[in-house]
Amino acid sequence: MEDIALLAVSKTFGAARIRECYAAGQRAFGENYVQEALEKIAALAATPETDEIEWHMIGPIQSNKTRPIAEHFHWVHSIERDKIAQRLNDARPARLPPLNICIQVNVSGEASKSGIAPGTEVGLADSIASMPRLRLRGLMAIPEPTPDASLRRQRFARLREMQKNLIARGH
């Protein structure tokens, strides 16, 4: 069985609260506002006892924010465009390991949600695979909230099929 890691969404919480969570054993923190995250990253980088923090960008990415994301984050969970992936690749410092990438999928087809449409994942995955400073790690989806358990299972089953398709193609 593979390990499961908890990603604590730390947006809107300050560095002091993150430090408390870190002391309790939490290591992965998700942010979706770049400026807010950079302030926390800087504050916590000055503290040696928090040197194992893993920063995850979980929000939408604007082109003008790719450089700080590439320079300060370990993971990006919201890639939906080749242009953003390319900019992250180009901005990722060579001294850092490749940036871990998840392709965001709009499994429920909601107009208000970001993400690629199911069935279009191969092209973006192929493109990311050709970028040496990025490492494709998986797919990410946030389906619509629904009390219908069958519909929830359907959405995640579709995501699982997409994952199998990518694995079969060597991703």
Which residue stretches match the model-derived regions?
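Conserved alpha/beta-domain cores
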Residues: 1-170
